[in-house]
A protein has these predicted regions:
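Short terminal hydrophobic/aromatic SLiMs and anchors at protein ends
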Residues: 10, 17-19
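Intrinsic-disorder-associated, low-complexity terminal segments enriched in Asp/Asn/His/Tyr and depleted
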Residues: 2-4, 24
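A solvent-exposed interaction/effector surface
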Residues: 28-236
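Accessible peptide chain termini
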Residues: 1-2, 34
């Protein structure tokens, strides 16, 4: 699935949001030793996988900021609004937590992708795609903190996507692999997963196609982009 242009827009939206929110506040003396939670390190297994080789992983329930949409992400204004809403709210939550003594690193963007017809992906009929873009947050973020951050973000941006929410994602047993290269080159790896690995292992689909975008497309050549591909499964 070719989403390189989308990833570029992700980077641009991130910069716009950071400018809208303002810089990370200057550290006060008591903040110098404040521990900063990095979920990529704390939950390392979720962000790592063998290159081009799917392995089973049990994914625990995880808290995410989420936003939904439908259609071609490269053309849909809704997609850019979703990203702006997610990043603005994620940074708003982060700064609020930091002011109370609990800082964290904003996690990489993730996406859930689906379509009524799986061939929509291989045929690149992007107008048929359904997507949910997500940013993982610490599990101590509650609904009240989210709603407060949402209000602040809306004041900054003027408008947020209506589907923005805090939700727990439960995937359970998954198969996960690392793809290095252009998003357009994921096809053969996905075909092997769907046509060989899952049938031979007695697995059926247990959830939506899940991608975790580890690379910064502004600084990374397309052939070196790192994407974790995750597929929730169930035993048939």
């Amino acid at each position: 699935m070719d989403r390189y242009l989308e990833a570029v827009s992700i980077a641009l939206v991130t910069e716009i949001v950071k400018r809208a929110i303002g810089p990370d506040p200057v550290k006060r003396p008591w903040e110098q030793q404040m521990e900063k939670l990095d979920l990529k390190k704390a939950r390392k297994a979720l962000f790592n996988a063998p290159l081009n080789r799917f392995v089973p992983i049990e994914v625990p329930p995880l808290a995410y900021l989420m936003a939904d949409g439908q259609g071609d992400p490269n053309a849909a204004p809704e997609y850019k609004l979703a990203l702006a809403s997610l990043y603005a709210t994620a940074y708003s939550v982060k700064f609020a937590c930091k002011a109370k003594g609990r800082d964290f690193v904003v996690s990489p963007l993730e996406g859930l992708w689906s379509a009524p017809d799986p061939e929509s992906f291989t045929a690149r009929r992007k107008d048929e795609w359904d997507w949910t873009m997500m940013i993982m947050v610490p599990d101590y973020i509650d609904e009240e903190m989210f709603l407060e951050a949402k209000v602040r973000s809306e004041c900054k941006l003027g408008k947020l996507i209506a589907s923005l929410r805090l939700e727990t994602l439960e995937e359970g047993l998954c198969l996960q692999a690392l793809h290095v290269g252009s998003y357009d080159d994921e096809g053969p790896l996905l075909a092997k997963l769907h046509d060989e690995i899952m049938p031979e292992g007695g697995y059926g689909f247990g959830g939506r196609h899940h991608e975790i975008y580890l690379s910064d497309p502004r600084k990374t050549p397309a052939e070196k982009l790192r994407t974790v591909i995750r597929q929730p499964v169930r035993k048939t």
